[in-house]
Amino acid sequence: NMMYQTAGTQINLDYLSENDFVKKFKLVASLTPLSIGIFANSPVKEKKLTRYLSYRSKVWQSTSRGGLPKIFLENLDFEKYADFILTKPLLFVNKGNKVIAGKGKTFQDFMMGNIKEIKNRKPKKKDLEVHLSTIFTELRLKKYIEIRSLDACEWDCHCAGPAFFTGLVYSSLEESLDIIKKWKTNDILNAYIEAPKKGLKTEINNKSIGYWGKVFLKLSKKGLISRNKINNKKMNETIFLKSVENILKENKTKAELIIERMKN
């Protein structure tokens, strides 16, 4: 049911080179707890309140093919990501019009021709694309960086997540990286686990996500202003950050507003 009962906002970001990818991927991975905490908007399951502000995040954290691998918080390059993908078990493989269970075999086994159920055939590009689509981590490498850690929300905030990360990744990258270099990997991973329940109160490096959200919101605004993308009303992209501004100003997530309405 989790694919039918959860909805997220996915964001795709470009990179220019492997070095550019390494920096952007590390930043986005490190900010995953903020993505969950700030954009928490799924406290309900089947018309009943759960114990979480982002129940969607909790559900996907619990899958064997999801989560935030520790290696994502290191200087992950293309080769290391390829190794990560190769050693992940196959969810399934296609045999003509049939779908065959992976049975613990990895994509590396597939490449070596060691899957007898498909007559030891080796993979094609399409097989790799299918395998990549069945890795449910909080972010993924494709021809772009795919962010998957935000809850979906209504129209007024739908562009907030993309705008938030656009401002950081494209125009305030080095300043953002300078901040997270002081964060310990285990602190980020702990915050990642706690964020679905604690939201803005989750702590990284002894400060709340609410605090860090304001720090990165300021950098995101700066980045969007420097991009200078103007609409026909002569307004720049910072207009899309209004929802995030309100959440951080009130120190209250959309999930908490839902909970208040349901309890009253």
Task: Name the predicted role of every residue range.
Residues 1-140:
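Loop-rich catalytic cores of soluble enzymes, especially ATP-dependent carboxylate-amine ligases
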